[in-house]
């Protein structure tokens, strides 16, 4: 019997699937994994067909599937299994999970078309003969006549433009003089506005614009736009210009009308690769450690059985070449390969590396997938993979769902990185999901890192993972020498507070004289951390979040790095109106400015989310640094990992201990990892490297052991702390947040949930909270937090699922409760 019903996962925030009837016309094309268009309430949604059945649901009226989008199922069977696992493990709505797995769909509009019926045409003739018509009849005549004259259906979105149109249409439909039919339309390719400073504007236009009297704010806005649109950076997308210059679209339009700006539209498209200079392939000579690791991986791939290996290798030990050769082996055996990297920026480098390494052998068989690609390009790459045209995929977290078939090898580079964890629904972990995918595919998963997460290294020690080790750098190059600079002693000696110690400045001066490069890490964006009033002690806060605003000098704005809110810098304190406002702390922007003052002849650039808002800008800066066109690169943590700069002999770490103050049990681990990773950027070429770590807390074990680059000692010490405090890997952990814009709702719901969780203590589950979250207000929502610890994963899952069911019974909105399983951040 032909299945007549289909279970469909829809991208709605509900932990359930929906049943639809399969019409006879689609019976042969609706299969598990198909993307289907279905009616949902008053709109059309794209969903995934999960399974077919001929069992009659217990619902009287079943809506039908409208359309099948693709000639072949979008998701192969193993990916459907993986999606169901993600939804179950992370307690996520199935539809949200499958939406994350699918390529961007050309957006749909569900409209009604109104057609003239036979009786409608007769009624139109009657109305035409009337000398005097009522107001309702006038509206009905206009609507019917429009349909008759145009000779085609009227779209429902045009009714609002006709006087009395919606009401007239309702009457005509009720009387059968119009008929309605649902239509699904595809939206056009997305475009973006590009803005450039018009250097070719006639002189009379420029002088006229200058002579016109303008308010101070208008002149300031124009200067900020001129500053942002420099010749060096070139044209910018409108959205980036508005953010960086802190101006409105109206300001841009005014300057465009004056001829000072040029504005045009172009499709969102992939930008060209600017990583030409400084790009080198790894050496072809493997050392003995690399050969042993590769032989192990080859044996696992040949066995065709699920295996997880942890490749622990010090920075510069040649893990990348092991990855590439392992992929070669998998391809030679007819399997496909997936390489995950933690940052979008690294996909550019690794993708180009793979294309250069495999060259014509794969005939353009390398695909790059990440969320920053324009929808059209991402869909194109995704379907190349699905059709089997690409056999190697490089991507970030979301690429774990790439539709590769016959998968043989999954590589997770820098597996410890928190960016593998999705911070929005569905809150899956890319590394752990990759391991489960490898299990479903009987494939090999290789996790690589110089600073493995405690959980992964613990699993390797316990025998759950196989441990591979690279303990020496390629060509036996020494690790960089690390020196700790005690900023307390520096302050006592110089009475100077700020970044870039005397030792660091002297070391940079030496590198400038020798012609080598310096890399300076400061993990703070902006110019100053916040603005403080010396009169009342208040800091200028975000209107939407319980966080201080960061000062960005280039934009002359105070900015919230959580919600994007910004405001002008106040001349007086908003709280007490004191004029004594003080800019506290030093960020990457200020450090760059000070280094330019200190070394006026040096070629200095900054790389952070403010200067590298597009792929082009990111590539331009890194490409210039790799090619030796820059002397000093200042950056946030995006410069700390994965890059191979042969001429860097000095790495400076400014304010190395700021992350230690965070209220998070992983704070020490993150600090150790960041310092070790950035230290690994020095001395990767033939010249030895030096690392200077500036800190006010030099005795902390994370600082001390990072300076010694002693991962095993750090692992033992941190593991002891985790065991004492019952944190992972010794317990299963979940973070539950209750949120709402009304604080009374958030308080009431969190108390109700606390009442439900209280009895769970008797089942061995430790419940901490509710308490105000560390970020108590975010995007105008008040947030209260629970932390649940359980000795076994199954216990925790049952308790969380029961808690969500309790919320549904108490009519607590699903959107008000966030469940984060295996959280990497407690914010």
Regions found by a protein language model. Name each.
Residues 1-449, 456, 461-477, 760, ...:
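Accessory, non-ATPase domains that flank or precede helicase/AAA+ motor cores in DNA-metabolism machines
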Residues 767-769, 819:
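Short beta-strand
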Residues 779-781:
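C-terminal effector/interaction modules appended to NTPase cores
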Residues 13-15, 25, 44, 537, ...:
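A generic structural motif
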Residues 280-287, 291-295, 304-747, 754-755, ...:
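Inter-lobe coupling/hinge segments of SF2-like helicase ATPases
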């Amino acid at each position: 019997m032909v299945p007549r019903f289909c279970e469909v996962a829809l991208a709605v925030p509900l932990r359930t699937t929906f049943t639809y009837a399969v019409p006879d016309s689609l019976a042969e094309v609706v299969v598990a994994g198909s993307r289907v268009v279905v009616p949902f309430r008053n709109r059309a949604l794209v969903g995934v067909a999960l399974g077919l059945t001929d069992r009659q649901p217990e619902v009287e009226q079943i809506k039908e599937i409208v359309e099948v989008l693709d000639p072949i199922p979008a998701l192969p069977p193993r990916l459907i299994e993986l999606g169901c696992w993600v939804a179950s493990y992370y307690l996520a709505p199935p539809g949200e999970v499958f939406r994350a797995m699918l390529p961007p769909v050309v957006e749909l509009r569900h409209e009604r078309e109104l057609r003239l019926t036979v009786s409608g045409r007769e009624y139109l003739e009657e109305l035409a003969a009337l000398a005097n018509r009522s107001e309702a009849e006038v509206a009905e005549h206009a609507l019917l006549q429009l349909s008759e004259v145009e000779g085609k259906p009227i779209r429902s979105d045009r009714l609002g433009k006709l006087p009395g149109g919606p009401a007239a249409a309702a009457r005509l439909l009720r009387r059968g003089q119009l008929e309605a039919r649902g239509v699904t339309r595809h939206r056009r390719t997305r475009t973006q506005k590009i803005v450039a400073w018009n250097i070719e504007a006639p002189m009379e236009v420029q002088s006229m614009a200058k002579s016109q009297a303008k308010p101070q704010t208008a002149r300031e806005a124009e200067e900020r736009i001129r500053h942002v649109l420099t010749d060096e950076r070139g044209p910018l997308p409108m959205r980036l210009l508005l953010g960086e210059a802190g101006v409105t679209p109206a300001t841009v339009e005014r300057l465009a009308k004056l001829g000072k700006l040029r504005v045009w539209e172009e499709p969102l498209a992939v930008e060209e690769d600017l990583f030409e200079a400084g790009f080198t392939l790894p050496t072809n000579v493997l050392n003995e450690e690399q050969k042993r690791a590769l032989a192990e991986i080859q044996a696992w791939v040949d066995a065709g059985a699920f295996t997880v290996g942890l490749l622990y290798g010090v920075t510069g030990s040649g893990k990348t070449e092991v990855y590439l050769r392992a992929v070669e082996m998998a391809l030679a055996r007819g399997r496909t390969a997936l390489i995950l990297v933690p940052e979008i920026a690294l996909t550019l480098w690794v993708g180009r590396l793979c294309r250069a390494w495999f060259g014509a052998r794969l005939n353009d068989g390398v695909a790059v997938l990440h969320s920053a690609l324009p929808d059209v390009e991402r869909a194109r790459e995704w379907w190349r993979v699905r059709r089997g045209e690409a056999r190697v995929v490089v991507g970030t977290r979301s690429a774990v769902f790439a539709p590769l078939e016959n998968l043989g090898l999954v590589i997770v580079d820098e597996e410890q990185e928190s960016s593998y964890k999705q911070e929005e629904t569905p809150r899956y972990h890319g590394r752990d999901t990759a391991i489960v995918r490898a299990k479903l595919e009987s494939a090999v998963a290789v996790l690589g890192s110089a600073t493995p997460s405690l959980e992964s290294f613990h699993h390797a020690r316990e025998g759950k993972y196989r441990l591979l080790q690279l303990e020496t750098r390629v060509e036996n190059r020494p690790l960089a020498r690390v020196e700790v600079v005690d900023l307390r002693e520096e302050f006592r000696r110089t009475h100077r507070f700020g970044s870039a110690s005397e030792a660091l400045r002297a070391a940079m001066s030496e590198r400038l004289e020798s012609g080598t490069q310096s890399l300076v890490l400061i993990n703070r964006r902006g110019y100053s951390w916040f603005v403080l009033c010396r009169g009342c002690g208040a800091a200028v806060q975000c209107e939407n979040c319980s966080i201080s605003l960061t000062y960005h000098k280039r934009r002359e704005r105070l900015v919230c790095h959580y919600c994007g809110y910004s405001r002008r810098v106040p001349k007086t304190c908003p709280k007490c109106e004191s004029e004594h406002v003080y800019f506290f702390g030093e960020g990457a922007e200020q450090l760059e400015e000070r280094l330019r003052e200190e070394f006026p002849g040096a070629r200095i650039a900054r790389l952070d989310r403010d200067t590298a808002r597009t792929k082009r800008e990111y590539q331009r800066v890194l490409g210039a640094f790799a090619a030796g066109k820059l002397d000093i690169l200042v950056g946030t943590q995006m410069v700390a990992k994965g890059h191979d700069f042969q001429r860097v002999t000095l790495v400076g770490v400014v304010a190395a201990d700021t992350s230690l103050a965070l209220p998070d049990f992983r704070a020490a681990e993150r600090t150790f990892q960041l310092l070790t990773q950035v230290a690994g950027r020095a001395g990767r070429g033939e010249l030895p490297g030096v690392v200077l770590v500036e800190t006010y807390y030099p005795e902390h074990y994370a600082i001390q052991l990072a300076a010694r680059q002693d991962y095993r000692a750090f692992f033992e010490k941190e593991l002891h702390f985790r065991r004492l405090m019952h944190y992972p890997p010794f317990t299963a952990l979940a973070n539950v947040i209750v949120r709402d814009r009304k604080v009374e709702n958030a308080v009431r719901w969190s108390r109700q949930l606390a009442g439900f969780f209280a009895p769970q203590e008797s089942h061995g589950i430790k419940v901490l909270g509710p308490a105000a979250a560390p970020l108590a207000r975010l995007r105008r929502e008040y947030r209260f937090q629970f932390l649940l610890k359980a000795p076994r994963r199954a216990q925790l899952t049952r308790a969380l699922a029961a808690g969500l069911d309790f919320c549904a019974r108490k009519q607590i909105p699903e959107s008000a409760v966030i469940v984060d399983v295996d959280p990497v951040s407690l914010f």
